[in-house]
């Protein structure tokens, strides 16, 4: 029997659900629909709650530029869908002492974005694979003794490792 491994997603992968454009990722639309609908065999999918806050901050930034209240309303429209995905578990690193401690160490090691530190710390605390496109954060994780062994995958790694047969 295959071990079930936690897969912790960075904010990038939920932004399209809020109508926020992201960098071009191979077959993102096709495979993200499968991920949200069916999950991923052999994995428990986690979304740190700080990703939701980060999405709201990004919408706020768009709102400031456009002064269009519909931009902010996209959060209220998208959040029920995200919460209804049975394939995704929300993890709150702010309520997990180990995740907080690790996030502080990542911040101290030089990563400027505390939200990113909390998201990465979630992957370490859950002993899972961290799915991210953040190269700078990945580099910092590899130099910290307690985070250097965390598995880090990009979207292309996920496609190559888990969706190759599709």
Give, region by region, the residue ranges found by the protein language model.
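Acidic, PIN/NYN-like endoribonuclease modules and their adjacent C-terminal/linker elements
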Residues: 1-4, 92, 120, 125-166
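Short, well-structured N-terminal submotif of metal-dependent ribonuclease cores
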Residues: 1-47, 61-75
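Short His-Asn-centered micro-motif
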Residues: 9, 49, 132-134
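Alpha-helix capping/helix-boundary segments
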Residues: 13-14, 51-52, 118-119, 136-137
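Residues that scaffold the ATP/ADP-binding catalytic core of kinase and kinase-like folds
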Residues: 16-18, 58, 140, 162
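Acidic, glycine-rich loop-and-strand cores that form catalytic or ligand-binding grooves
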Residues: 78-81
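Active-site neighborhoods of divalent-metal-dependent phosphate/nucleic-acid chemistry enzymes
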Residues: 87-133
């Amino acid at each position: 029997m295959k071990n079930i491994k936690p897969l912790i997603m960075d904010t990038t992968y939920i932004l399209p659900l809020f109508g926020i454009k992201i960098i071009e990722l191979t077959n993102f639309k096709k495979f993200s629909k499968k991920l949200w609908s069916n999950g991923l065999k052999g994995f428990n999918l986690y979304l740190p709650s700080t990703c939701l806050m980060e999405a709201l901050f990004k919408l706020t930034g768009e709102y400031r530029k456009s002064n269009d209240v519909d931009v902010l309303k996209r959060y209220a429209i998208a959040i029920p869908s995200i919460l209804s995905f049975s394939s995704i578990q929300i993890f709150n690193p702010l309520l997990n002492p180990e995740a907080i401690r690790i996030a502080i160490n990542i911040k101290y090691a030089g990563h400027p974005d505390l939200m990113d530190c909390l998201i990465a710390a979630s992957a370490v605390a859950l002993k899972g694979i961290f799915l991210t496109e953040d190269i700078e954060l990945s580099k910092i994780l590899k130099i910290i003794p307690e985070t250097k062994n965390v598995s880090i995958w990009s979207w292309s790694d996920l496609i190559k490792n888990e969706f190759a047969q599709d």
